[in-house]
Regions:
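Conserved, well-structured functional cores that handle cations and Mg-NTP chemistry
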Residues: 2-157
């Protein structure tokens, strides 16, 4: 996204014409406006159902398939999405005297998905397969989440 487009989006946000996800992902550009738009649609659905699975969140098969197509598109880089979110998180830290950086490691189990590739052991069992996710969440002392500052994903061989 060039400087002119960033300025246009910033002015639209200031005028109240931009949804929350456009502010959150300001500057993110997949090189295809359809993908940029699809991210917004996906984020709005996820906002309404943050803990639901993709099929539960998107309800219809067509919407579910569109979400899966988005995530499998080679132009969609999860690192770029997270980088944009992390930048927005850092901007929300401004003016806060104390920020809590809360960390936790979670094991994501795919043990029932035998054909999934790229997984590792998540405990001492040879049958428990998945990956580890370690986010650092920025939170105010009042408990308001500001976003993810950092995240690490790894598999244990």
């Amino acid at each position: 996204m060039d400087a002119r487009e960033k300025d246009k989006r910033a002015k639209a946000y200031e005028a109240g014409d931009v949804s929350w996800y456009e502010e959150e992902f300001l500057g993110l550009n997949f090189g295809d406006s359809r993908l940029d738009k699809r991210l917004g649609i996906i984020m709005n659905y996820r906002l309404k159902s943050p803990s639901g699975s993709i099929p539960d969140t998107f309800v219809t098969w067509a919407k579910t398939k569109a979400a899966y197509r988005f995530f499998s598109n080679d132009k969609v880089d999860p690192e770029l999405i997270m980088k944009s979110h992390k930048n927005s998180t850092v901007s929300r830290l401004s003016g806060k005297q104390i920020i809590l950086a809360i960390q936790d490691t979670t094991d994501i189990s795919y043990s029932s998905h035998k054909d999934t590739e790229g997984l590792g052991y998540i405990n001492d069992s040879e049958t428990a397969r998945g990956y580890h996710y370690h986010p650092t969440l920025a939170v105010t002392v009042e408990g308001t989440p500001l976003g993810i500052l950092d995240s690490q994903v790894w598999v244990r061989e």
